[in-house]
Design a protein with these regions (language model features):
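Short beta-strand-to-loop capping motifs
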Residues: 28-33, 102-104, 139-141, 181
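Intrinsically disordered, low-complexity segments enriched in Gly and acidic/Ser/Thr residues
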Residues: 140-194, 199
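Extended intrinsically disordered, low-complexity coil regions enriched in Ser, Thr, Gly, Ala
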Residues: 33-58, 109-114, 145-169, 207, ...
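Extracytoplasmic beta-rich ectodomain segments of secreted or membrane-anchored proteins
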Residues: 59-149
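Short, flexible beta-strand-to-coil junctions
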Residues: 30-32, 75, 88, 101-105, ...
Length: 221
């Protein structure tokens, strides 16, 4: 289905229920050192642009050559967002950076539209050419997922992504499959020898549950 996000199509191939959608972004805002007060003002501006109802106060402070500000909030679609601002200075470098972590545990009608909207808003905070926007889909499998099932599920997911598998690691309590898909990389951001899709399974013996995580660490079309 053309309206689906490639990661959504891949996840559906696994047959597992999608339980959460997370994004992680980190970017440089400018080449200046900002005080904690200035970061707090910036945090309030970001809160308005993200249309957040804050669930925590803005926490800010200075620690020598480092200043910071952070807060959490929630959007109307139940996306929980954590914003972190950090500014540092030295004899060689002044820099302010922004980190944004989002998580949504509800069922979304259009994941592609949701992710594209988030990415447009988040990347709009910076003019940097090297903004990372990672996407993580997660769910659970009841019991311990054996190697054969990991191979089967990763194969189904990677075929939907037209991905070439570049790595497969088996460990006692967890497995990792990595691949490269041209459906996910933006032009000139990843080389063929790298990977831009990763499937991780981690067995939690106390709950007899295997956590399944499908992640793309870079930009997406």
């Amino acid at each position: 289905r053309i309206y689906e996000h490639p990661l959504e199509t891949a996840w559906e191939a696994s047959g597992l229920k999608l339980q959460s959608i997370t994004t992680e972004s980190w970017m440089k805002l400018n080449d200046r050192w900002l005080t904690a007060y200035e970061l707090k003002e910036l945090a309030n501006n970001i809160k308005e642009k993200l249309d957040l109802k804050t669930t925590t106060e803005v926490i800010s402070g200075d620690q020598g050559e480092l200043s910071y500000a952070s807060f959490e909030g929630i959007q109307d679609d139940k996306t929980v967002i954590t914003v972190t601002l950090q500014s540092s200075r030295s004899d060689y470098l002044n820099e302010t950076q922004l980190g944004i972590h989002t998580v949504n545990n509800s069922k979304l009608k259009n994941l592609r539209q949701y992710l594209n909207g988030l990415k447009k808003t988040i990347t709009g905070f910076s003019n940097s050419l090297s903004i990372n926007f990672a996407i993580i889909l997660a769910g659970e499998y009841h019991g311990k997922m054996g190697r054969s099932l990991v191979k089967e599920i990763s194969g189904k997911m990677f075929r939907k992504l037209e991905a070439e598998q570049v790595d497969l690691i088996f460990e006692n309590e967890g497995n990792i499959a990595r691949g490269y898909s041209t459906l996910l990389s933006e032009p000139n951001t990843l080389q063929k020898s790298a990977f831009n899709i990763e499937l991780t399974t981690i067995y939690d013996q106390s709950r007899n549950i295997t956590e399944v995580v499908l992640a793309s660490p870079g930009g997406n079309k």
